[in-house]
Amino acid sequence: MALFTRSNPAPTTDQAKTAADIVDPPVARPTIAAPARPSIVAPPPPTDRQNQLTQLKVKLHQQLVERLDMQNLRTLPAETVRREVRELIRELCRSEKGLISSSEQERLMDEVMDETFGLGPLESLLKDPTVSDIMVNRWDRVYVERKGRIELSDVTFRDNTHLRQIIDRIVGMVGRRIDETQPMCDARLSDGSRVNAIIPPLALDGPAMSIRRFGTKPLQLEDLIRLGAFPAAVMDFLAAAVQARCNIIISGGTGSGKTTLLNCLSRYIPADERVITIEDAAELQLQQPHVVRLETRPNNIEGRGEVTQRDLVKNCLRMRPDRIIIGECRGGETLDMLQAMNTGHEGSMTTIHANSTRDAMARLEVMIMMSGYEIPVKAMRQMISSAVNIVIQANRLTGGRRKVTRVSEITGMEGDQLCMQDLFAFEQSGVDENGMAVGRFVCNGMRPRCADRIEHRGIRLPSDLFMRRVIET
């Protein structure tokens, strides 16, 4: 007999209370002046010479495609290809009757190479190690994030058609498609960078694209300490919790560093454990030898063949995993993940979108409802209470600085309510002269229930780790 009945009705009155049990009355607030709108200086319009070089680049690219055996070139070493293309470009440039200087010729060669074998104008940004995000709003508006701050770059595409060609090239590399019938697509680059693209009719100003980059060398928890994400005391506890096979959920907003933190925590999974990762677009970088990576698949052109995260969670339970890591829970797979945590797959981890550790619990309830099963609220909360041990909140603060702002533990149930206690928290006191958030980390003096579990695994924690205090960073 099935434990739950399958249905798709609207949530009951009892279920509708899960997001917030109490609604506060409106409170009069003082009027606050809107902050000054930052001015973004658009790049200057191209000069006649720049337009001439752009037209020449297009012409050279077309001639290269006509004269080179592209299929054969892709199998040759990069240096051999570069040498052959260099000679051909020089030959083509000579036909321009000396109108191109040697420096312009070198630059044209690099740009034509990028256009032919790379991702066109994006190549210069992808080679820049300081760029963490690339946001293409339209063909002539490309923004980047450097050190937490967003700025307008001088990179542009020729037009919407050129941008669409690059998008098609990216999604084609991972066997996906984007067109009017499927105008949104997730993909990844060869270096693991995550790509999301959207085209008209959904994107009103032309194709748009976002690229989340990941360093070639995965960050470690020690790197996050150096960057000020959290102090060493928090790292000691989180590393011990992973080794002791606590189930962990990382909560946060877009760009708050959830995936980076998940990658860092995975470093402490013992090498002899079998780990299965499940993602929509593969971006986790686990370093253990015994890892199986699974990725979802969208429908094909006939509208069939979709494989969802929920399908993969159900399948991976037959693959004898010690731990399951889901890149991000968004829907009904949350129920399957919690059931796996409750049935012997301890030490599993995932991320979700929420604004606080307590909001994360409400989000879990909502996503359980999305599974299509009619489960009483109390049963959902009991499931969460028995499955999840630690909830970590990551935030992108004022000025772009990313921090772990709270580490909480689920302590059980009191009546129908889920109970949590905060172990560590970041208290923001303001901003510095550079507009960056400043504050202090505090330990709330609560000894976690999982501390005994950690010690039973033979892991020794500092005696003063959970003492109530301000933590030095």
Q: Can you annotate each of these PLM segments?
A:
Residues 72-75, 95-102, 117-128, 170-187, ...:
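Active-site phosphate-binding and catalytic loops of NTP-dependent enzymes
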Residues 279-292, 316-413:
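Conserved P-loop NTPase nucleotide-binding/switch module
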Residues 250:
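Hydrophobic anchor at the beta1->P-loop junction of P-loop NTPases
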Residues 1-151:
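N-terminal anchoring/assembly modules that precede and organize ATP-driven motor systems
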Residues 258:
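Conserved lysine of the Walker
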Residues 128, 136, 141-244, 462:
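P-loop NTP-binding catalytic core
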Residues 215-226, 263, 267-314, 360-364:
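P-loop NTPase switch/communication element
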Residues 403-473:
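NTP-binding/hydrolysis catalytic cores, primarily Walker-type P-loop NTPases
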